[in-house]
Amino acid sequence: MVEVELKFQIPAARRTALLKALDPKKSEQIQLQAKYYDTEDRLLSKSGVALRQRLEGTRWVQTLKAAGKSHIERFEHNHDLGELERALELDLNIYAAAPEAQQILNNALGDQISQLKLQFETNITRTLRVIEYEGTEIEVALDIGAIRTLEAEQEVHEVEFELKSGSIEQLLAFSFEWVKKYHLWLDVRSKAEIGNLLATQQKVSPAVPAKEFQLSKKDSAAKALCNLIAQQMQHLLPNIAAISAQVAEQDHIDQAQQALEHLYLSVLLFKNWHSGISDKWAHQLEAFNKQFEHLQHLQHMQSTLAAFLQNPTTAENLSKDILYAKEKLGNLVKSTQNVHHYLELLIFSLKEDVKSTQDLKTIAQATLQQQYKALQEQINQTEIHDFEQLDLLAVRIQELKFSFPILTSIYDVKNLQKYSKALNDAQLAAAEYQTLASSAVYIQQTELEASDWFVLGWLTAKQEVYAQKLLEATEQFLISRKFLK
């Protein structure tokens, strides 16, 4: 069985109002006591699997959950153990009659099934109500309680929206109404994940990295884009959740920025692949991503320029700007507007464009040709001292660096590495040029002491060096790309 649900965290100031909205007279309240099992080295958790026994009212239920194709869908197998005073010993024989569940366990545990043991427990009061919305039945469940190990405890206060019948689109639309009213923020971390972190005395799971995406020749252009967006959301949301929960490490911020940049470039460069792409998405994602880029540039300057700044006030102001940028980012990732963006992109990734009949290889080739043409036109009007045009050239290179491995995955071309290397050289020069340019702009806007003016001169000189490298590497790439007719 596939479970379709979304989970949100509730700001403390909105919790009472949300509980009232459920209307206790129309809601059911049940106690949920659960025991979660795993091996000492967390084989289930590492595979995105959770195994629990839970007292639901008067009955014990054994549940196996596994990650689905998106953060909105999960595999779930429930087995009613009956009305018992206490939970039975963990029984894995029940999965002999459930091939998919058995395969999930086998893949995760191998020959370590006997090593499963209790890792943590939860004690939750759940207030739930089924609400009909636009022909769709949605179960709203407010969970209040705690996750506990022998050494630690973490409060739970969250709301889940589960699709009981109807469309996923209506589930997401309904969820957003509650997001707006109660300032909810999307959290893809499960209770099992939080419990495992408590049990291993960690604050946060490792950052989720990007996965390589390859086009499937069997897909339409529209389906390919939906699959690409879905994969990018799988990359984005766990890292955004860590930032929203204020437990993120630098790698979570870096990975979230990369995911946002990839989403922005996907809806910008491939927008004619699918009629469901909104014109506003690229602008929204670009603006959001620029906040991450701003923080990244400030941190880069602190690590590379701080030692050169003679005036302590300049260095102090840079540190203050970094703290402010981090605080602003922490608020932005869980803002109502951005949570709405996440939900819109989730809706998009889960549906195909029924109007689209475009052949994937044809449109992929056309997209690549358009980018080459734009790059050629840009370099034709770019000179070494024209920083504005150099900025645009760097942008064209960054766009092509993103799209090239995706678009060329559908070609039967040997030695693509040669073209990739030429493009990579251009991209490295573009990235360094952009970093230097941003640093120079920041320094120019700062009230520098005379002793610090040499830093601006040094940046300008380095900027010109990498501008020349960018021009030369771009010319070399354009010469090398003869496989595209």
Q: Where are the regions that the model predicts?
A:
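Function-determining surface determinants
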Residues: M1-K485
